Amino acid sequence: MTCRSGEKADNASMKNILIAYAGALLLLIVADGLWLGLLMPQQYEDWIGPLMRESPLLLPAAAFYLLYPVGVVTFAVLPALTLESWQRSASLGALLGLIAYGTYDLSNLATLKGWPWQLTLVDMVWGAVLTAAAACAGFFAVRVWGQRND
């Protein structure tokens, strides 16, 4: 979007931020649920079974899923909306996911005995892909349902 002055319009209204958050959150929950619940549970069990709980603790899991989209929107969606570029949203999301998941996985690899390097690699790639997709979901949610300033 371009304003009459030729400058890019600010798409960071509270409504757009909440729409982007909802889009990113929904994608994160669905995609990570499929990843952890259907596609990879046996692999995680094989890699880190003794470290896993019978059932995850809901409060820390909820805290993660409520907080992470804040970072996705702040660092990947809003800058991309300013440039009107879903590709920017995807690339910033991938970078954020690589850094965030890398922080967790590389720290575990460095400090925990028996932490598998294979899990580190797979999880970092998954973090990049998941976060890129969440950023795009937030971006396109704003494009479809958000306020436009033209």
PLM features per residue range, with description:
Residues 1-13:
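Short, Lys/Arg-enriched N-terminal segments with co-localized hydrophobic residues
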Residues 13-150:
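Juxtamembrane/disordered regions of integral membrane proteins
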